[in-house]
Amino acid sequence: MANTKYYPEVSSNANFAAIEREILKFWQDNNIFQKSIDGRNGESEFIFYDGPPFANGLPHYGHLLTGFIKDVYARYQTVKGKKVERRFGWDCHGLPAEMQSEKELGISGRLAITNFGIEKFNAHCRASVMEYASDWEEYVTRQARWVDFKNSYKTMDKNFMESVLWAFKELYNKGLLCESMRVVPYSWACETPLSNFETRLDNSYRERSDKAVTVSFVLRDKLHEIPAFAGMISRESEMTVGGDYQEYRILTWTTTPWTLPSNLAIAVGSDIDYALVPQENICYIIAASSVSKYAKELGLSGEENFEIIKGSQLQGLRYKPLFDYFEHHPNSFKIFDVDFVVEGDGTGVVHMAPGFGEDDQILCESKGISLVCPVDNSGKFTKEIPDLEGVQVFDANDKIIIKLKEQGNWLKTEQYIHNYPHCWRTDTPLIYKAVPSWYVKVTQFKDRMVELNQQINWIPHHVKDNLFGKWLENARDWSISRNRFWGTPLPVWKSDDPKYPRIDVYGSIEELEKDFGVKVTDLHRPFIDKLTRPNPNDPTGKSTMRRIEDVFDCWFESGSMPYGQAHYPFENKEWFEDHFPADFIVEYSAQTRGWFYTLMVLSTALFDRPPFLNCICHGVILDATGQKLSKRLNNYADPLELFDQYGSDALRVTMLSSNIVKGQELLIDKDGKMVFDTLRLFIKPIWSSYHFFTMYANADSLKGEISFASENVLDVYILSKLKIAVSKIEESLDNFDTQTAYHAVLEFFEVLNNWYIRRSRARFWKSEKDTDKQNAYNTLYSCLKTMAIAMSALVPMISEAIYKGLCHCEETSTLSSRDLIAGSSKSINNLNPVVKPRDYTPSVHHNDQISVHLCNYPTLSDFEINHELVATMDNVLDICSNSLFIRSTKNIRVRQPLASITIISKHNNDLKAFENLIKDEINVKSVIYCDDLENYASKKLSINFPMLGKRLPAKMKEIIAASKKGDWKAIAGGLTICGETLNNEEYKLILEPYSHIKGAASFENNSSLLILDLELTAELIEEGYARDIVRFIQQARKDAGFSITDRILIEIISEFDLSEIIYNYGDFITEQTLGEFSKNFTPDYVSKVELEDHPIQLKIKKS
């Protein structure tokens, strides 16, 4: 009669991609995601905001990384008993959609769009923005991320847009909006301004080489004729160089020659020293520190002495404009001393073009100089510069330089390499240009944002006061209007007659319908533009209220996501107030200038609250050489192919166990080796323990039960380690630290596989089904089932497969041959999936859930950790692992016995209880105990230079010297050196054996030492051979396909004399292999091996 098998038969070489496909189908067929939400009563919720991506392109690795993090914490909080709604969202408006549509329609520029028709253009945008929505759903689903796609919000939905209108009017009513003409970063390729924070996104600064030009402006005023200079410049000093200067010229340097036609002022540094450099009848004015750079151009030998003046003495001097375009502009063409001009590059003199520089505009406005901006929306000169009309500004540089040479104002041209901002959509260089725009007056409440930021837990922590905190401290007013087409229109109507000014701002569809008397079904352009009405302030009745053409910056919409998704305040008011702020959000670190920032601005201005309480800023993924992942470079694999080869759990672990979750970079290779290594080193060890349990439990027809009652020392130890791991995972995920959580999982399974299972093999293998054997199965079952729940958020599909196999095997279906073929063809190892044995009886417990993701997080509250046992057994493990490492470095195989190990420790009495275990594990004959550590080793101080160097940079030389001399003293909780107290993270004490001690290693945090006796006697060598023979026979049994319980006949044929070995160790060999030596039988299997380079033929047969 066949054995009853309670668990599925699983391969040790499983096809994890095929298993994952089965799990995805199981989730879908059984509606597990929805059950995970419905199963929580909502009294305790975890509020999660899902930042909306654009759907006009496929997801990339950055999206997958963010999605993995989002999914981990949503799943974790669910098993912790909280209700976690996960509504997906889509960014639909803005430049990404417009640029894509222009490309698809074959048009470019505002004029072309207007001629094409705004209605048709926006209709195309509407259709195209969701082009890849189904692909997104495929990717997101395949990565095992649970989100609600059916109820997703879209920023182009009327309800969402209406909430945006409400927010705008609220800001307007609070006095936090203004319309202003300001210099802002401007994309001439997109014909729209950008926010200052958009120039900080996605590494938008690029290295660029520009022509820098030095030009001379002729002063209208001669210095020696000005009373202020009379006592400083003597007539005699002038006469020594040829008499009165005919001209004074001030030298300026700029990397944007195209702005020179718009020059209206010059700025010098108040406290900078300027030299008066004579050349024939001309006296040049230049920063004294820059004179040497222009020696050639000014004809200097380097030996000259010059008169020096302060920049403040140049204040108010007049100069002649370079060009006559704006020569009559009021209050212009004067020198002003300021504090923002610095020495360094250039001449220490800055030309001011208030239409193209923020500082320029501020200075000129303060001096009563209005700006000029002779550049149109496409970055081309207007008719105000007639000889350059229609020329793109960057193409005009050479023409301007030629003209300067002709006029005699040119001095020098050089190539200047610098980091320059580029458009984040078109990658074209930006210009800074004065444009009319609506602004959120961020500067009025930025101090409050800084205060509210202190309520947010940032991961990594330094983001709070550095990356994000500094950005808030220096926040500027936010330009939120864009002169584009596809976006939420600004709800501002103005009178078309300046004689009768009026501005109306609308915050709801109801207000619009009331004033304009029409039903509003679409808030987009051009429909909203058609809403006009007579100006109530015009008694003549001739003027009309018309909407301004601008639409919102799409970042305003992203920042409106918390209330926009709920159509607040028009609906769901109570829901929103209960779901704001979010408990958690996550994006990559550049979003401190993007989504995180816009959320913070609007949340502070509208609600005086932080928008979220916990935020992870992860790093970026690069290729193996450190380059950005790019289709053009073809330097990354399709994620779906990676999933089909290794499974998505492996990619999840690869990413979330790395430093990228702490804001650092992750380099990932195109061939997937890193993911394969994760599969090999993380996923497979977990599966191996599960495979071991099912294989032997089925062989013994035994069921495991959740039990913590065993008193076996190995059981108590592993169950204690289990509770420690479960607690560590919980603590780590509570602190938003996946890296530590994954380490806790890996560390536990290393101990489970390499210690508990290996040291308990005899208990599983023995034929008696006694209490000890059942305890071993119960303990292993308890570990696997408990860890499946604890790590379910970290490896959701492998956890589900293990949990179902242990608890709900009746629902584990056999994979179809089609699945097997598909999986095998894409798998590097032709791996096998989970299959169900024919004589299979499911093991179901009354308190089991249908899915691991419907369980509650394990507490193990009834089990007390045996801390003393854990500490001692950890030391035993440390001793054994170090001993095996020494063997490895000395090329001494583990089967080769050694005479002894010497242990020098304060805890020898505790270790003696495990002496036999140590002897067996590391294969030594005896254990010698000592406590006189100083006779064997000394402690050396190792400094953590990066950490201590930041705190004590000036003392590092002295500390290094003292550490080498041993001039330090250990104290409670630290160490003193050179008058400084170091904490435990700033140093490490390393136990260093004396040079004559061989085979030594430290353990127990460098407080204890072990020494292996590496001398091999003839007797030890012979016993080693016997153990080799056992291994050869065991391998032959496995290769022959024998069962672990089959007894066998053995014959060994060799020219190498094995008689002494068989005589002395024959009983040991047969006992270990369930065999007996025999001759003259027909073997079932023959194996050929080598022992010390001697060929051996090994014959075995079932007896």
Curated annotation (Swiss-Prot):
Catalysed reaction, written as an equation: tRNA(Ile) + L-isoleucine + ATP = L-isoleucyl-tRNA(Ile) + AMP + diphosphate
Pfam families the UniProt entry points to: Anticodon_1, DUF5915, tRNA-synt_1
Gene Ontology cellular-component annotations: cytoplasm
Motif ('HIGH' region): 53-63
GO biological process: isoleucyl-tRNA aminoacylation
The EC number(s) this enzyme carries: 6.1.1.5
Xref: PROSITE patterns: AA_TRNA_LIGASE_I
Cofactor: Zn(2+)
Gene Ontology MF: a single term: ATP binding
InterPro entries: aa-tRNA-synth_I_CS, aa-tRNA-synth_Ia, Anticodon_Ile_ABEc, Ile-tRNA-ligase, Ile-tRNA-ligase_type2, M/V/L/I-tRNA-synth_anticd-bd, Rossmann-like_a/b/a_fold, RPE4
UniProt-listed CDD domains: Anticodon_Ia_Ile_ABEc, IleRS_core
Binding-site residues, ATP: 631
Keyword annotations of the record: Aminoacyl-tRNA synthetase, ATP-binding, Cytoplasm, Ligase, Metal-binding, Nucleotide-binding, Protein biosynthesis, Zinc
Motif 'KMSKS' region mapped to chain: 628-632
UniProt-annotated location(s): Cytoplasm
Principal location class: cytoplasm
Entry text on domains: IleRS has two distinct active sites: one for aminoacylation and one for editing. The misactivated valine is translocated from the active site to the editing site, which sterically excludes the correctly activated isoleucine. The single editing site contains two valyl binding pockets, one specific for each substrate (Val-AMP or Val-tRNA(Ile)).
Subunit structure, interactors included: Monomer.
Function: Catalyzes the attachment of isoleucine to tRNA(Ile). As IleRS can inadvertently accommodate and process structurally similar amino acids such as valine, to avoid such errors it has two additional distinct tRNA(Ile)-dependent editing activities. One activity is designated as 'pretransfer' editing and involves the hydrolysis of activated Val-AMP. The other activity is designated 'posttransfer' editing and involves deacylation of mischarged Val-tRNA(Ile).
Similarity remark: Belongs to the class-I aminoacyl-tRNA synthetase family. IleS type 2 subfamily.
Protein name, as recorded: Isoleucine--tRNA ligase
Gene this chain is encoded by: ileS
